[in-house]
Amino acid sequence: MKKIALFLMLVPCFYLSQMKTGTFSEMEALQKESPKPVVIHLYTDWCAVCKIESYHLNKDKELVNLMNDHFYFVNFEAEKTKEKIHFQHQEFEYLQNGNSGIHELALALSKNKNQSVYPLWVFLDKHQNLVYYQEGQMTPEKMKEKLLEISAL
């Protein structure tokens, strides 16, 4: 019984140190009230590197605080998100391809228009201009470096 109680008390602690995520529509509404730079993370549920990366990034409390305090963060599942998304005055839809598919926005954000690479990171300034783009895994150290560079703009 004591182990269960301890477990129930510790579980919320793990969730307290996670990056706050939102949707594209939430981010655009918040941008109108309080402009901040934006970090967009494109991933898929089958991407093992994405899961490992997410674990390591959320484990770094300094990074989590920096992200939550100074940026809007959109965690975008490129192959499962099926709703229409309005972003930068354009509308994007899910492109069905048999039993799977990909969202048009994932292709629009990717420099490789035929097939996105995951994980994919897109950093925008508070005016939604591209300031950094990275395909592949992002380490906590590299993420902090980029966030500090962008927040200084």
Model-identified regions with their sequence ranges:
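Bacterial Sec-dependent N-terminal signal peptides
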Residues: M1-K20
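A short beta-strand-turn-helix
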Residues: K20-P37, A106
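Short active-site neighborhood of thiol/selenol oxidoreductases, capturing the structured segment around
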Residues: S34-A48
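Short beta-strand and adjacent turn/loop elements
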Residues: L42-T44, G101-I102, L107, Q134-M143
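C-type cytochrome heme c attachment motif
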Residues: D45-I52, L120-V122
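Typically the conserved alpha-helix immediately C-terminal to a functionally engaged Cys/Sec
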Residues: K51-N68
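Thioredoxin-like thiol-disulfide oxidoreductase module
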Residues: L63, N68-L120, L124-L130
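Thiol-/selenol-based redox modules, centered on thioredoxin-like
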Residues: F123-L153
